[in-house]
Amino acid sequence: MRDLYKELAEYMGRNYDLVKARCQTAHVELAWLWEKYKDNPIAFYRETDLYIFALTRYQYRLQEAKAHIWYQYMIKKHGWKIGLDIGGGIGEQTILAMEKGVKMVYTDIQDSRTLEYARWRFKRHGIKPWVVFEDYKIKRDFDFINAMDILEHLENPKPVIKAIHKHTEWLFCNPDQLKYNKWVPQHISKFDLTKYFKHIDLYLWRRK
């Protein structure tokens, strides 16, 4: 297993245990801050470093659940060569895919702390994905697209879902795991993939 907490502690230049502890509580601070930023979500995602900590914990939990092993297995099984990581956060899904030889396009909010950290991680792991920003429009086909924990943050996710459907056969997404409560007020929309995709396995969906 990759020690994601160790990487973040190295990046922040802070104590490992302190960094790990902040990862466990970052979601509370994010929920608290939302009231200030709810009318300007882009600023929310751009300015706070809390998402680095929250996403590190999230990816660590996926790693513990063997989801990363499954993700790389699916890449190998299907022989995918090029993928898109929408709202790629700390870059873990991009790194995992590129470890298996996939060419990746990574998208995140320009000048955000998550993008800054992801770029540091890409360099640390010796990979060079194509990095684009939040205004990126999907205009080419991909073997697969990753949209884990992304669409619920969009005010209107339907155009993005339609673009994904047009440009890939395979989608990684987790709508059945999403929560809508006081702890995640930044989840501002609900969506239904079933008109466009069929659920295949765990987080994997196939275009209808």
Question: Model segments located where?
Answer:
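A conserved beta-strand element that flanks and buttresses the S-adenosyl-L-methionine
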Residues: 146
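A short, conserved alpha-helix within the catalytic core of class I
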Residues: 154-163
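Conserved acidic residues
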Residues: 81, 143, 169
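Conserved beta-strand signature within the Rossmann-like core of class I S-adenosyl-L-methionine
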Residues: 168-179
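Conserved N-terminal segment of class I S-adenosyl-L-methionine
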Residues: 1-138, 178-208
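Hydrophobic adenine-recognition pocket in adenosine-nucleotide-binding enzymes
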Residues: 150
